[in-house]
Amino acid sequence: MSLIVLGTASHVGKSMTVAALCRALYRRGIPVAPFKSQNMSLNSYVTVDGSEIGIAQAVQAFAAGIEPEADMNPILLKPKGDSVSQVVLLGRPYKDVQIRDYYRETDTLLAEAVSAFERLRSRFGNVVVEGAGGAAEVNLYDRDIANIRLARSLRLPIVLVADIERGGVFAQVYGTLALLPEDIRPLVAGIIVNKFRGDPGLFAPGVAKLEELTGVPVLGVVPFADIPLPSEDSLSIADKRDRKTGTPVRIAVVRLPRISNFTDFELLEEHVAVDYVPPGGTLSGYDCIILPGTKNTVEDLAALNRHGVGEELRLARERGVPIIGICGGYQMLGRRIVDAGIESENPAEYAGFGLLDVVTAFTGYRKTTVQVRRRATGPGPILPAMGEVDGYEIHMGETERGDLSEAFAGEGASTPDGLVFGTYMHGLFQNPGAANALLAYLAKRRGVAFEPVTAESTALGAAASYDDLARHFEEHVDMDAIMKYFIDRRSE
């Protein structure tokens, strides 16, 4: 069997709930797969076969002990700006669409999503489905293929997740249930109150009141837990709290308007202060500056130029501050970007920041999506110390390198001193070797002690984190009530 996890709003903990359920089933030896029909996120992941899906579904797949695949997130929307999103269908670029045009295709896309779900269910037996945003968006009911229309098609039991941390949990739950369509409301089998601060037992009267008001059982009150797993979307940036506020080493990640895959830096956040600095914020005083990925290189480059970021980068370069570009950030560090109307409406040529001798051309609607393993081969104090690294590429455009040294075998570029380099490789600094190489140099330059990164880590978190999440969830949720919705094929 299967169930659907819906939420009262965005960022209430649906993704973590699905990951926890997947891990809990995995720990019981029960096969399960995650599923989200439609995800809107700029944090994505590349599967073994080169399919692109939302990073949350990849996290959930690894929690379930299986490889991520396209059917787990058949529709991925990647906002490009001005109400335009790239639609990734079954792991491959489909087209760029205005939101109004997208809504005209929801019947077809829903059919694709249901087919993907059925393929997963036929193979795994159990599927944990995640909704999107808030379930009770009444103005979208006729085109909501991630919540209401999907629930209507699948007719699965629903668990509703609410976030008590932001306040108003009674209104969240009662209002959502009251607004659900009459044919959907009876499917709601339970409520989970998430992100409680303090002793959950103190909310016992609240549990009783919720059950009295709604007639739906509360399956658990889950305390807030700071378990290191990748973030799904840019809402998470605002919630980031410096875990290492006392460290003298500080890294600036330029918060691009269309920042993507900022999960690249979450391992670094565990060890030094990482600030996400918006355009217009100062970059002076940092030990390292990173330009991350973006869904629209041309538009975000223009935004940085409007705020004088290029001059700040040149001054940082004069001070010997390491400057690193990842994916779109790598493209921006080059001399020139030639766009044939792929990134913007009209063909044009744009000057980059000129710190790397590379030129990027967008000549066709082709996307590179591939997992990679490379050895760092560049010069200087950082790159040679990285060793072999794993990651993945997700990018439009092709970059030609001038006479500069390559940063990684066959890819990337570096200045002769190795203090400015760029790569298309996402997940670079999720490799402990790469993180140690950077942090050791920054600590030495700052004149402070360096504590190496030793924890097991992958691009999507350590297995221990998944286990911690499952244990935390199971401790506070009525698992007996939930387990009746899943089948154990071992007994068949």
UniProtKB/Swiss-Prot annotation:
Gene Ontology MF annotations: ABC-type vitamin B12 transporter activity; catalytic activity
Gene3D superfamilies: 3.40.50.880, P-loop containing nucleotide triphosphate hydrolases (3.40.50.300)
Keyword field contains Endoplasmic reticulum: no
GO annotation terms (biological process): cobalamin biosynthetic process
SUPFAM superfamilies named among the record's database cross-references: Class I glutamine amidotransferase-like, P-loop containing nucleoside triphosphate hydrolases
Domain of life, per lineage: Archaea
Catalytic residues as annotated in Swiss-Prot or TrEMBL: C327 (nucleophile), H426
Positions of the GATase cobBQ-type domain: 248-434
UniProt pathway annotation: Cofactor biosynthesis; adenosylcobalamin biosynthesis
Function: Catalyzes amidations at positions B, D, E, and G on adenosylcobyrinic A,C-diamide. NH(2) groups are provided by glutamine, and one molecule of ATP is hydrogenolyzed for each amidation.
Family: Belongs to the CobB/CobQ family. CobQ subfamily.
Name assigned to this protein: Probable cobyric acid synthase
Organism of derivation: Methanoculleus marisnigri (strain ATCC 35101 / DSM 1498 / JR1)
Lineage: Archaea, Methanobacteriati, Methanobacteriota, Stenosarchaea group, Methanomicrobia
Encoding gene, per UniProt annotation: cobQ
